[in-house]
């Protein structure tokens, strides 16, 4: 089913999740949730498929309730180990160029895994809310790819990594002055840096009778599987201090990348970054991309499998800004970070991980989140580039196991 309006999205979410939705807490200075054991929520009965889980208790509203994960569950054990290993890590510091982000308790720390079958594993501050910031960018560009096409995203915005910081004006100037293949070079960079994300908002088609903000928020809600809202404190704080982004959007207008009202595009982008989410939300949103664009909790086909694949390709290229190559080299999965402390990592066809920990490294990525995801995926085998040698083909076409020790050719080469 393809969703066409925000109102349809909200109706779907209410019907699917019912009144049994969990309560959600907003992260604030000095607040936080005490460390908790891993809990698991089974997928909705009608979406469970072939996932083998003990029967889940269900709330009166129809939403499966969390329960302790069964002993020996490999995902639960890996999640608990990753959480404990980095719980006391004190590296990094909160973003301070957006004043309100500097006040968030740096000890908040949550990890969540959501499988494509809809099982949810969570530990720590998994439901504390924070501003989504740049983690919103892949989901908006997924909607643009779905409605305007992948080609226009490549042409108007670009899909290559910039090698510069996420808000770099230098990167815009360098891209604008590349002498060759000008039809393919755009100063916006890609949809996951600020210039490209603002251009993405400008490019987003709006169905008749809807406003653009309704499309943006409704799309994020469809990915998350629940109603979301803007944190007004964050929105005001960003709006009062976003002078750098104002310069960026004026350049985008001068370069004819932004074709509408530049200040409107910037305001919509700022609102988008100010939406409140939790690590659990990010994991559900990532699992929707991992599941070919189908939300594993609501069953809604939010975007097509093709749009989800294109989106993940962009995330793999530029999700962690100038450190994306290093991340892909070490971890091997697409991931997107935000200066609010969130990270979403996606293993296509399997699961997604959502994390929340406010202290950041110099590139703007959560320090604890990166370390925890890397440790978790090492145990769960999520690296997309990892493989084992295949056996030799027999004349029948069957594969025989690879022999122990070096092959004869390798052995000869050692002599």
Residue map of PLM features:
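Active-site SXXK
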Residues: 118, 131-154, 285, 353
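Bacterial N-terminal signal peptides
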Residues: 10-19
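Active-site-proximal alpha-helical segments within enzyme catalytic domains
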Residues: 138-144, 248, 276-295, 347-358
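Structured C-terminal helix/loop/strand segments within mature extracytoplasmic catalytic/sensor domains
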Residues: 58, 291-415
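Bacterial N-terminal signal peptides that target proteins for export
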Residues: 1-9
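Active-site-adjacent helix/loop patches that line small-molecule binding or acyl-intermediate pockets
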Residues: 67-85, 89-91, 144-272
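A short, well-structured edge-of-sheet supersecondary motif
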Residues: 87-123, 344-345
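Bacterial Sec signal peptide processing site at the extreme N-terminus
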Residues: 20-38
